[in-house]
Amino acid sequence: MVLVIEIIRKHLPRVLKVPATRILLLVLAVIIYGTAGFHFIEGESWTVSLYWTFVTIATVGYGDYSPSTPLGMYFTVTLIVLGIGTFAVAVERLLEFLINREQMKLMGLIDVAKSRHVVICGWSESTLECLRELRGSEVFVLAEDENVRKKVLRSGANFVHGDPTRVSDLEKANVRGARAVIVDLESDSETIHCILGIRKIDESVRIIAEAERYENIEQLRMAGADQVISPFVISGRLMSRSIDDGYEAMFVQDVLAEESTRRMVEVPIPEGSKLEGVSVLDADIHDVTGVIIIGVGRGDELIIDPPRDYSFRAGDIILGIGKPEEIERLKNYISA
């Protein structure tokens, strides 16, 4: 008993600070007031008194009860006033809570409770392209800048206010429950700090990082990034290879373009697939589905243009190019 009293004494002040708790206690007090009043003034049972209290507070007025004493009439009037007043206060507080919560969400001040979402740490023009590609997915951008917040909300994504290099803010974005984390910060040193913070929280979440300088790619990998992309290296090489004809750059841009009729796609081979143990030649994927096979990923290895005698295994990732309907046929063909 002493332990229970001590627990109540310790936690009660904190619980009472919650607006919802105070409203609940106010409603409960009115119900107790009405039930006790009808019981002692009108002489009704506790069950009937509780029922009359709810009917009176709700102003339903079924017509199955009216006070039989003058004191009961006065009491009913006070209960109606208290009931309507309490209901009005409860609705006002509820609306205030919902509005404040929505405002806090827009400001990025609410912790992310989602799972299997994508977290983007930082902001750049690359981020904007990411958001276009991830349209329809649950995406949260973690950044501090007010201008970034406006851009994120305009793009239809969610904003989380915080410093991507701070572990507490990474936890706020719930990187532990994320499907993947994209790190797109201004400098490689910030990117490394961010990756280390993410790995401190979750050792298995997939991290894709952007490298500002080519010589830092290996350091980002050592910090814990699963995939490191250097847009400057890619664009530089494509520009240099476009000097003579430019078809290589044209191919990459067309395949990756948002409005392209053909898309590059990764399709995993599941357990029990009809392609398990089947060679590239016998699978005849292009003739069956229309998808052009560029390569096959197995573990950390990417086999570009796999030989005809290459046998597929469960867990292999087929990298191909095709139209949306061809890609759908490939998925159905693999899972059949």
Swiss-Prot record:
The consequence of residue 184 to N is: At high calcium concentration, mean open time is short and mean closed time is long compared with wild-type
Chain sites annotated for binding Ca(2+): 184, 210, 212
Query: InterPro entries, per this entry?
Result: K_chnl_dom, NAD(P)-bd_dom_sf, RCK_C, RCK_C_sf, RCK_N, Trk_Ktr_HKT_K-transport
Give a yes or no for keyword Calcium in this entry: yes
UniProt-recorded Gene Ontology molecular function terms? identical protein binding; metal ion binding; monoatomic cation transmembrane transporter activity
Q: Describe the subunit structure.
A: Homotetramer.
Q: What protein am I looking at? A: Calcium-gated potassium channel MthK
A GO biological-process term: potassium ion transport
Annotated RCK N-terminal domain ranges read 115-230
Determine the domain of life of the protein's source: Archaea
- Comment text on domains: The channel is composed of 4 repeated units, each containing a transmembrane pore part and a gating ring part. The gating ring is composed of eight identical RCK (Regulators of K conductance) domains, in an alternating arrangement of one domain from each of the four subunits and four from the intracellular solution. Two protein interfaces between dimers of RCK domains from the pore-forming subunit and from the intracellular solution hold the ring together. One is called the fixed interface and the other the flexible interface. The flexible interface forms a cleft where calcium binds.
Where does this one sit in the cell? Cell membrane
Q: Where is the RCK C-terminal domain?
A: 252-336
- Please give the residue ranges for the topological domain Cytoplasmic: 1-20, 96-106
What kind of membrane protein is this, topologically? Answer: Multi-pass membrane protein
- Is Transit peptide one of the keywords UniProt gives this record? no
| Protein role | Calcium-gated potassium channel.
